[in-house]
Amino acid sequence: AASDVYKRQVVKWPDGWGVGVRPTRFERQPVAKAELPDDAVVKLIYFHQDQVIRLPEGAERVASSDFCDEAGFTLCTTDGVQTVLCLQGHPEFDAGYSTALLDSIESKVGTDRTKAARASLAKKTDSTLVAGWIKQFFTIAAQRRGWAA
């Protein structure tokens, strides 16, 4: 995890794996002019056991969830440009890929949690919206550094 680079602020969560489609509450825009839903909640596929328990120095939380307090954060480099965006949810995952992952580690996740996760994968996610934010985030970072974007 990116946060792990910054002073071991990541742990294996004692409550086990966070898997399936989960709501993520955005406390602020992850990128300038990001269009947040009216309730500031987006649904993403989660697939993790590690969690950030303390944000790195200089990081700003942008999101939390019922399973992970630090579900998203941004971090500036020493020149003040936001160049790190971390999200606990996976906008790049789809239901098929997540089902295959669940099949491969069901014994670690547990039968009940796996069953609930599989059922949740039928829900619509906001992955396309979040992917647009990620693209915008890095486009802005590149422009601020004078890189072609």
Regions found by a protein language model. Give the residues of each.
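Post-Walker A helix-loop "phosphate-sensing" segment adjacent to the P-loop in P-loop NTPases
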Residues: 7-11
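Long, hydrophobic, well-ordered secondary-structure blocks that form the structural core
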Residues: 13, 18-24
